[in-house]
């Protein structure tokens, strides 16, 4: 069966990233009874980490923006955490500082995850943030995990949540959310890889129609209508203004089932 690209989640680039203490309780046994064995707290934390999927860990980390839970953030982060958001410092302490700042801010921070998937050591999240009441933003977050299951690196893009839907009535966050077709992950990854090379990088533009099922194409860009025709119209309008959309290099393609980024 021929595979087609059917949907696009398009957002504008910008930025976001914003995370200890621990308490132990001791118990005593009755005189004469054998002392009860206990598990060190560090081992308990390790066991909890191992029981969570990487997606669950990533969701727990972004949740600390709203909860102010610096202890959880520190447990999840590698101490040499690398931050690629140019507005924030790199390292575990910088992340913790951001969480502490949000917790002390007058405005409330909210975090609403919309969709997620994971690919090996990487987790992708699409989330609506409102940092300290400054306004809702839609974000793409990518987290990389190290060999110990800790979050070691982060990239993100943010755009303001549009007040109105696009010309076809779609928003930045509606559409398919469930991850399906896990057996087609690599097939879908290859499809998008070839699409980027042939069409977006301009190597074989005549193949554009091969990647779509006629004019069926759901668009989530705030300014572009559905369909290949809608995309072509938008690109033509940009070209008339002297604006080009240029893809020089594909650095990373993440995929799980029916989602590819």
Model-derived segments and their meaning:
Residues 1-4:
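Positively charged n-region of N-terminal signal peptides that target proteins for export
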Residues 7-13:
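Sec-dependent N-terminal signal peptides
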Residues 16-20:
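C-terminal motif of bacterial Sec signal peptides marking the signal peptidase cleavage site
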Residues 22-24, 30-261:
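C-terminal and inter-domain tail/linker signature
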């Amino acid at each position: 069966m021929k595979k087609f690209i059917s949907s696009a989640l398009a957002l504008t680039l910008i930025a976001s990233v914003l995370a200890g203490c621990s308490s132990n309780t001791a118990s005593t046994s009755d005189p004469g009874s054998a002392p009860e064995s206990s598990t060190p707290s560090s081992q308990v934390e390790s066991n909890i980490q191992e029981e969570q999927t990487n997606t669950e860990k990533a969701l727990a980390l972004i949740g600390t923006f709203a909860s102010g839970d610096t202890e959880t953030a520190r447990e999840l982060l590698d101490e040499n955490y690398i931050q690629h958001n140019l507005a924030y410092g790199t390292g575990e302490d910088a992340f913790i500082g951001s969480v502490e700042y949000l917790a002390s801010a007058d405005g409330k921070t909210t975090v609403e995850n919309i969709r997620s998937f994971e690919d090996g050591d990487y987790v992708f999240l699409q989330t609506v943030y409102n940092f300290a009441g400054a306004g809702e933003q839609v974000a793409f977050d990518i987290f990389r995990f190290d060999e110990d299951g800790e979050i070691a690196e982060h990239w993100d893009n943010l755009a303001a949540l549009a007040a109105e839907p696009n010309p076809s009535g779609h928003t930045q966050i509606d559409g398919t959310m469930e991850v399906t077709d896990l057996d087609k992950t690599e097939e879908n990854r290859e499809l998008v890889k070839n699409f980027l090379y042939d069409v977006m990088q301009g190597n074989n533009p005549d193949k554009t129609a091969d990647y779509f099922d006629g004019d069926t194409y759901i668009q989530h860009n705030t300014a572009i209508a559905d369909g290949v025709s809608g995309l072509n119209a938008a690109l033509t309008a940009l070209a008339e203004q002297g604006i080009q959309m240029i893809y020089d290099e594909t650095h990373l393609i993440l995929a799980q089932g029916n989602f590819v980024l």
